[in-house]
Amino acid sequence: MAEGAAGREDPAPPDAAGGEDDPRVGPDAAGDCVTAASGGRMRDRRSGVALPGAAGTPADSEAGLLEAARATPRRSSIIKDPSNQKCGGRKKTVSFSSMPSEKKISSANDCISFMQAGCELKKVRPNSRIYNRFFTLDTDLQALRWEPSKKDLEKAKLDISAIKEIRLGKNTETFRNNGLADQICEDCAFSILHGENYESLDLVANSADVANIWVSGLRYLVSRSKQPLDFMEGNQNTPRFMWLKTVFEAADVDGNGIMLEDTSVELIKQLNPTLKEAKIRLKFKEIQKSKEKLTTRVTEEEFCEAFCELCTRPEVYFLLVQISKNKEYLDANDLMLFLEAEQGVTHITEDICLDIIRRYELSEEGRQKGFLAIDGFTQYLLSSECDIFDPEQKKVAQDMTQPLSHYYINASHNTYLIEDQFRGPADINGYIRALKMGCRSVELDVSDGSDNEPILCNRNNMTTHVSFRSVIEVINKFAFVASEYPLILCLGNHCSLPQQKVMAQQMKKVFGNKLYTEAPLPSESYLPSPEKLKRMIIVKGKKLPSDPDVLEGEVTDEDEEAEMSRRMSVDYNGEQKQIRLCRELSDLVSICKSVQYRDFELSMKSQNYWEMCSFSETEASRIANEYPEDFVNYNKKFLSRIYPSAMRIDSSNLNPQDFWNCGCQIVAMNFQTPGPMMDLHTGWFLQNGGCGYVLRPSIMRDEVSYFSANTKGILPGVSPLALHIKIISGQNFPKPKGACAKGDVIDPYVCIEIHGIPADCSEQRTKTVQQNSDNPIFDETFEFQVNLPELAMIRFVVLDDDYIGDEFIGQYTIPFECLQPGYRHVPLRSFVGDIMEHVTLFVHIAITNRSGGGKAQKRSLSVRMGKKVREYTMLRNIGLKTIDDIFKIAVHPLREAIDMRENMQNAIVSIKELCGLPPIASLKQCLLTLSSRLITSDNTPSVSLVMKDSFPYLEPLGAIPDVQKKMLTAYDLMIQESRFLIEMADTVQEKIVQCQKAGMEFHEELHNLGAKEGLKGRKLNKATESFAWNITVLKGQGDLLKNAKNEAIENMKQIQLACLSCGLSKAPSSSAEAKSKRSLEAIEEKESSEENGKL
């Protein structure tokens, strides 16, 4: 190895070759990841990975300027109805010549060829200087070289044999401490560690694709450095090509090695149904034209070449090479490590992995020998097993025994309409659709019909109607098809007394014992649970006083349409209309009695738990803005129903998130109107098995807790999380419905929207990929801080970039709690909410803990965080000495709890950084990397796993280099901090819990105590708010500490298992393995016994 790779390098003079040797210091140095390469070589087109082309190809500078102009974010939330989109803006162009200027990367051979041709990379120095250099791989594959350089040619090189490790991303000290690091694209950066001291050569490519080529190629060369490099002979003997030959020969009935083009096209479509026939035919023509032949017959070689170019997704190939230790296939062990370390799958075994291989590998040889090649791996990643949605949430997974008021309830507005509320006819299919979608609250707006038969109709036009009886028969049939949990019928009664009696009789007859009519118990304080009300139908409506002698009476008419009347009428005097109600209909109303809202103070004093209020969107918005805390507290006990403003004459939808943030349970939506708001609603209720009930966050359920719907900061007692999303690629994007451009040309980009409390709302977008709908590569990473994960949703939106109105392609909305980590495919939905076949986004998801406040736009490293003053959640002064003295006792335990959690997290991040891994990496990945550093040249470990008091320590087996000492020191610190937390957590948590209990003893008398001390009005309210804040902090920090302890215990288990699998254990005998297994359980058993002793 030449020392030139890491030695001092002065900036080259301005007159050096091409003038490119001047260091570029500043934003221009790394802000643009796509720049023209020197030497007449073609640059990346962003529609695929470019291999070298002919010299003299002009640089696409105009396209670069257009890309920069389009970089301004747009509001993707404003999605227009595609049927109303009009032509306008620039025209999209279609090229009818398809000879490619680039070739996809589909093998290691392609990577090596690219590296030998060379390309420009930016070389980053520790002094923050950046140099443009042209890097190439020697023809003998033994060294990297770069130019221009002031060094001798033999020094401006790096021997492949000296390379220890290749890291993708900004994961070295040079990148982390460089002043320009924030301006360097994470996905374009990579580092080559070399020499005994692991010095780093830090580089930035012009695109993520180019970075992936270099990383994959170098890893392949390093892994093969001790083996003959015979792969350069070509790809003809790889398992993939052998399988394709078998497929071709089976279809070649004549056995002459030639097949009709039509037959070849059909065969490739059978192997990959997502491909378009026209694209396959075009590929054959390209291949034949390159060979200067024109024929309608295809050879075996041409068939294999076409299939590999059409069906190889470069981003999947790079991933496979990365996790397979640079083979071009995965064995069972590779797959097991991928599932455990990257996908977060637990309890995985070799047999499970072999079963996956047998189900997804396409070749018979692969299935028999137990390996998964690129095509089978692609199929596996596209399968439901790698869906982004957590399969546990596809069934009922939440506690269903809480009071009804503790759940969000899937609700429909104007269920009987299938169009807008002015022109739309009444239709029975509206109920069928809503109930099949898991709706648990439907609306029946009933009026008098002819022949004493109540009807449902659109009272704005009275054109068509359906009979009340037919509607409730349909409801009875479909009520519990999608969910067994209770169905609420919101009765809009506009009938005369005789027809009210008919309604009551028909409901009794059709629903029978499904009708819930039990009188509420005054001794109870909360509504029954969904579990207790399973398969029951609850009628919401007006109710007469309980006097049985009163057979009929007047009640207030809270017709939703009265809002419009009040707005439109100049004669409205504020008095509510009275209607007559019969006893028979009144008796069907039990635990959902409609009452009028006055104010929160009156409601909290006099409202019964079985009474509920309906709020118009306008009124609810006003209340949410003026009294956010009161609204949340009110909804802990009482049900609230929110319905869209009557001014929405087009039946557009309100934003349900605004009212879910206030704890409102029944936010009624116009199911007949698709769009972003309905996407949020549909996505939210996919969780918990789609049963129509979603448990609200505990901070919105606890009797004493502090939460404001308008909060824009960190919540007391809730630890914010960092959500890392990498948008890798898209697959098979359709042309937008109603788009005006000819052909299938689209310029897609992706928006990521975070919906939740105001503190969490955020939006980011990718770059635009020009003219690529089949497999656009985005390769962009985003990070978001999520303060209340239980109430957050992520919406992926794909749009077609246009100067006038970006057109909708597809979207997918998912609750934060349903995200699966790792590499996942996102199935996109159409504008009306239907899943589009084969249309997906390929993403990587990671969720990590985050300390401190502020929006998470840039990664905070532990080294930097350690220099900051640690922020502690502070308790508030109430103004009542007795209570304040109790809460003061908790100050020290709270600081201890926060210190233990943060110290452990910082120690974990530090060891990850030393391993060259980002904070999102798992400890399993960390130990795999660490073990590779601790294995000597003769393949023996330099350290050994030693269990001390059931904790996994690593001890040197002799003298070790300073680099390894540094890593072991960081590892020991992680174990020490984890051990300290595990051993001290229960004691500290007990102190916090005791302070919380002591404080809660004053809860009932808080107002009286405040009055005695002279607190009243705003001061008393402030004292009550501060008391709730303190209780919330204590409960939350206690729970966080308990969770941190469980996490630490699980980490110790994973570390020990990883050490065993990586060969860092002295004795692999069965007795040693049994002893290790017992050690895994020792900590947990010890902790369990201590907990049981306290009970």
Swiss-Prot record:
<dbReference type="GO" id="GO:0048015">
    <property type="term" value="P:phosphatidylinositol-mediated signaling"/>
</dbReference>
<dbReference type="InterPro" id="IPR011993">
    <property type="entry name" value="PH-like_dom_sf"/>
</dbReference>
<dbReference type="Pfam" id="PF09279">
    <property type="entry name" value="EF-hand_like"/>
</dbReference>
<feature type="region of interest" description="Interaction with PPP1C">
    <location>
        <begin position="83"/>
        <end position="222"/>
    </location>
</feature>
<keyword id="KW-0175">Coiled coil</keyword>
<dbReference type="InterPro" id="IPR001192">
    <property type="entry name" value="PI-PLC_fam"/>
</dbReference>
<feature type="modified residue" description="Phosphothreonine">
    <location>
        <position position="556"/>
    </location>
</feature>
<feature type="domain" description="C2">
    <location>
        <begin position="701"/>
        <end position="830"/>
    </location>
</feature>
<dbReference type="Pfam" id="PF00168">
    <property type="entry name" value="C2"/>
</dbReference>
<dbReference type="InterPro" id="IPR000909">
    <property type="entry name" value="PLipase_C_PInositol-sp_X_dom"/>
</dbReference>
<feature type="coiled-coil region">
    <location>
        <begin position="894"/>
        <end position="914"/>
    </location>
</feature>
<comment type="function">
    <text>Involved in an inositol phospholipid-based intracellular signaling cascade. Shows no PLC activity to phosphatidylinositol 4,5-bisphosphate and phosphatidylinositol. Component in the phospho-dependent endocytosis process of GABA A receptor. Regulates the turnover of receptors and thus contributes to the maintenance of GABA-mediated synaptic inhibition. Its aberrant expression could contribute to the genesis and progression of lung carcinoma. Acts as an inhibitor of PPP1C.</text>
</comment>
<feature type="region of interest" description="Interaction with GABA A beta subunit">
    <location>
        <begin position="543"/>
        <end position="567"/>
    </location>
</feature>
<dbReference type="GO" id="GO:0051209">
    <property type="term" value="P:release of sequestered calcium ion into cytosol"/>
</dbReference>
<keyword id="KW-0807">Transducer</keyword>
<feature type="modified residue" description="Phosphoserine">
    <location>
        <position position="569"/>
    </location>
</feature>
<dbReference type="InterPro" id="IPR001711">
    <property type="entry name" value="PLipase_C_Pinositol-sp_Y"/>
</dbReference>
<keyword id="KW-0963">Cytoplasm</keyword>
<dbReference type="InterPro" id="IPR035892">
    <property type="entry name" value="C2_domain_sf"/>
</dbReference>
<feature type="coiled-coil region">
    <location>
        <begin position="1034"/>
        <end position="1059"/>
    </location>
</feature>
<dbReference type="InterPro" id="IPR001849">
    <property type="entry name" value="PH_domain"/>
</dbReference>
<dbReference type="GO" id="GO:0035556">
    <property type="term" value="P:intracellular signal transduction"/>
</dbReference>
<dbReference type="GO" id="GO:0007214">
    <property type="term" value="P:gamma-aminobutyric acid signaling pathway"/>
</dbReference>
<feature type="compositionally biased region" description="Basic and acidic residues">
    <location>
        <begin position="1"/>
        <end position="11"/>
    </location>
</feature>
<dbReference type="InterPro" id="IPR017946">
    <property type="entry name" value="PLC-like_Pdiesterase_TIM-brl"/>
</dbReference>
<dbReference type="GO" id="GO:0004629">
    <property type="term" value="F:phospholipase C activity"/>
</dbReference>
<dbReference type="Pfam" id="PF00388">
    <property type="entry name" value="PI-PLC-X"/>
</dbReference>
<feature type="compositionally biased region" description="Basic and acidic residues">
    <location>
        <begin position="1074"/>
        <end position="1095"/>
    </location>
</feature>
<dbReference type="GO" id="GO:0046488">
    <property type="term" value="P:phosphatidylinositol metabolic process"/>
</dbReference>
<keyword id="KW-0597">Phosphoprotein</keyword>
<dbReference type="InterPro" id="IPR011992">
    <property type="entry name" value="EF-hand-dom_pair"/>
</dbReference>
<feature type="domain" description="PI-PLC Y-box">
    <location>
        <begin position="585"/>
        <end position="701"/>
    </location>
</feature>
<dbReference type="Pfam" id="PF00387">
    <property type="entry name" value="PI-PLC-Y"/>
</dbReference>
<dbReference type="InterPro" id="IPR015359">
    <property type="entry name" value="PLC_EF-hand-like"/>
</dbReference>
<feature type="region of interest" description="Disordered">
    <location>
        <begin position="1066"/>
        <end position="1095"/>
    </location>
</feature>
<dbReference type="GO" id="GO:0004435">
    <property type="term" value="F:phosphatidylinositol-4,5-bisphosphate phospholipase C activity"/>
</dbReference>
<protein>
    <recommendedName>
        <fullName>Inactive phospholipase C-like protein 1</fullName>
    </recommendedName>
</protein>
<feature type="region of interest" description="Disordered">
    <location>
        <begin position="1"/>
        <end position="61"/>
    </location>
</feature>
<dbReference type="GO" id="GO:0120163">
    <property type="term" value="P:negative regulation of cold-induced thermogenesis"/>
</dbReference>
<dbReference type="InterPro" id="IPR000008">
    <property type="entry name" value="C2_dom"/>
</dbReference>
<dbReference type="Pfam" id="PF16457">
    <property type="entry name" value="PH_12"/>
</dbReference>
<feature type="modified residue" description="Phosphothreonine; by PKA">
    <location>
        <position position="93"/>
    </location>
</feature>
